[in-house]
Amino acid sequence: DGVINKDVSYLYKISDLEWVDGAKEALAYAYSKGYDLIVVTNQSGVARGYYKESDVQILHDHMAHELDCSGAPILHFYYCPHHKEGSVQLYAVDCECRKPKPGMINQAIKDYDVDPKSSFLIGDSQRDVDAAEAAGVKGYLFTGTNLLDFIKTII
């Protein structure tokens, strides 16, 4: 939330999805330059009982389809459903995957044999950048309004 889709509190409904300006184009641009596209996202709404993991998966499937149609195939969506103060006991844990910890990024590196030194992560909060750097990946903080303009300063 906040990088490829607009940050609406606890997004899980497809009807609430709004793409950040230039997001689809930015991802297609990165893909055209040889980058694999992987998403890592905290989804504490699951731990808080606002929605279920299946809702996250449905939304991610929809996003993946739209992005694929835009020339930006997502290799994998990693998400963390945990929050140590969650109300759903199963997910109310202090895990290794919730950013700013690097667990999801490390898992992606392992699963897809990613070279951290030739990779980068764009996030909308310092915890995203911290997670990237803890995994040996360059992190960039996106605070603008157009992701394509931003990514062209990186690639």
Q: Language-model features: where?
A:
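Active-site neighborhood of HAD-like aspartate-dependent phosphohydrolases
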Residues: 1-38
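Catalytic P-loop NTPase motifs of RecA-like helicase/translocase cores
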Residues: 4-6, 47, 128-129
